[in-house]
Amino acid sequence: MMTLEDCRSFYAQEVRWTANLSSPALIDAYARVPREKYLGPPPWQIGSADDRAMSISGMADMNYIPTEDPRDLYHNVVVALDVAQNINNGQPGALARWINALDLRAGDRAYHLGCGVGYYTAIIAEVVGAGGSVVGSEAHPGLAARAAENLSGYPYVSVHAGDGAQFDPGACDAMLVNAGVTHPHPLWLERLREGGRLVLPITMTLAPMPTVGAGIMAKITRRGGAFWAEFVSPVAIFSCSSVRDPQLEAPLAKALSSRALLKMKSVRVDPHEPADTCLVHASGMCLSTAEPAATGQAKAT
């Protein structure tokens, strides 16, 4: 019979190949962090990633299988945190792909918005190490309290309870946003250090589920005062209501349905008139296909 340690090692390799991970430190973190510690007492309710995708888009109800064996948690599955509200500890493979895109390094300062109960925040913390620091933010009071308790063993990790979009995380090397937005929050761009990476879901609202959006995970990197952008993965996710502009929903839906958003190369913050390269244009922010070198310089903070 496999021990928990065996299961964690196998799980880390499963996630590695599922998400095509390039970071040995991230793979090791998946093998070290005990998932069961973060999920509350058994029985745990386990669901498949496919069921989760259909559930969050309103196509079908979520189905769970109960288990009391912690070894069952070490697969690429979601685990219910609040069945009534359809809140889960997310799919390990998807989160791994997003965290991998952060290009975390030892000593980095990271911000995780929508940290849930802190499991993936702990994985980030393992990668940056005690020489770095991590701030998690969670709007759900109960989950935030659980995250703070779960992460108390990491002295370099703190948890903010409340709307993460209204919270100033300070200067960061890496930010992971776990809630759908129509655009990058200006403060997040300002707080990125030179070379800093922001990974976030840019989504359009789904008509059957007004609190859920579908779109892309994008990676934004600050280099030379400009913000470079690239596609990471498709996504369906709960929305961050405070970083959604109703005026951007229509152009965003057009850019997504035409697949033009996959060609995004920069986030422009310089004043300019709408142009053919503008995918989603707003005052002070533009998702653009223009090369970053052709955009105006962002002011460092």
Map each language-model feature to its residues:
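SAM/dcSAM-binding transferase cores
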Residues: 1-11, 202-301
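Class I SAM-dependent transferase core
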Residues: 1-111, 120, 127, 143-145, ...
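Generic hydrophobic alpha-helical segments
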Residues: 36-37, 195, 227
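Alpha-helix boundary/capping detector
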Residues: 37, 41-42, 56-57, 124-125, ...
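Residue-level detector of alpha-helical recognition elements and their boundaries
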Residues: 44-45, 113, 203, 247
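Short, intrinsically disordered/low-complexity patches at protein termini
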Residues: 51-52, 134, 252-255
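Hydrophobic transmembrane alpha-helix bundles
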Residues: 61-66, 79-81, 150-153, 197-203, ...
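Conserved nucleotide-cofactor-binding alpha/beta core module
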Residues: 87-214, 218-223
